[in-house]
A protein has these predicted regions:
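N-terminal pre-Walker A segment at the start of P-loop NTPase domains
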Residues: 78-99
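Intrinsically disordered, low-complexity and often Lys/Arg-enriched segments
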Residues: 1-17, 252-260
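Phosphate-binding P-loop
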Residues: 99-107
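Conserved post-Walker A coupling segment in P-loop NTPases
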Residues: 107-111, 127-130, 134-153
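Walker A/P-loop nucleotide-binding motif
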Residues: 107-123
């Protein structure tokens, strides 16, 4: 007769010690409940092993995704859960194609340009969040982050070395180019990033200006080769229409009512 009582403490302690030694965190956490269930329901040993290994695999996958989300440094936590496809000027078939992430796997770039408030940053971040959920590594910057990176490594000329871990990402997002004046350091940082990522890592940028107008933001000697590399393998999407944020504000959707 199979006993349904608790697993002997000595056995539990040994399993815990072995799991710690082998760094099987999720098996260690779930083995007490799994083993009790397996004993009560008379599982086949192979099924018990399968359930424990699946718990470890799923736990590690969750941990990896959370780590990638943290290192991506997304600014606002915007995902497709809050995305209103029907309010975007981007055609729905194009939105669906972008969400497939096949362009990331092909190391192609994405440029989303258009007026303020038309969903450029939201779309970029939602794509980045989706990429993380599907196992990709993502990094998020605004253009002044790149300027700060250049300045911090100028003295010892280690900017190329500093970019190496960034370039391990599957997708690099640079947000809001052209929203503010671009410093020479930021322009250099953007060029160095685009040049180093060329044909190896996907870069997505959002901008109030079409890249053909980047020479209004930075010296043409940097803008020209930067745009050449950025657009060579890029999908260019131009958003249109009035600001969605302003429309929500005018309709009273940007705040909770003070009185009900």
């Amino acid at each position: 007769m199979v006993m349904n009582g608790p697993i002997p403490q000595a056995v539990t302690d040994e399993i815990t010690a072995l799991c710690r030694r082998l760094r099987l965190r999720y098996i260690r956490e779930q083995s007490p409940d799994v083993l009790l269930t397996a004993k009560a329901q008379r599982w086949d040993p192979a099924e018990t092993l399968r359930v424990l290994l699946q718990a470890e695999a799923e736990g590690r996958n969750r941990s990896t995704i959370e780590h990638h989300r943290k290192t991506a440094r997304f600014p606002a936590g915007k995902t497709f859960d809050a995305w209103q496809a029907e309010r975007s000027s981007v055609p729905v078939p194009t939105q669906n194609a972008l969400q497939s992430l096949e362009w990331v796997d092909r190391h192609e770039n994405l440029v989303i340009c258009g007026p303020s408030g038309t969903g450029k940053s939201h779309l970029c971040e939602a794509l980045g969040q989706s990429a993380v959920d599907h196992g990709r590594n993502v990094r998020w910057f605004n253009i002044e982050d790149l300027g700060a990176l250049v300045r911090s490594h100028r003295i010892d000329d280690t900017i190329t070395k500093a970019l190496k871990p960034v370039l391990r990402a599957d997708l690099i997002i640079v947000d809001d180019i052209g929203l503010l004046p671009v410093s020479s350091d930021a322009a250099e940082g953007l060029y160095r990033l685009i040049d180093a990522a060329y044909e190896n890592t996907s870069v997505a940028v959002s901008s109030n200006l079409h890249p053909s107008g980047f020479d209004q933001l930075m010296d043409e000697t940097i803008a020209s080769p930067l745009v050449d590399r950025l657009l060579h393998h890029a999908h260019v999407i131009v958003t249109q229409g009035e600001s969605i944020r302003l429309e929500d504000a005018l309709n009273g959707k940007g705040v909770e009512p003070l009185t009900k």
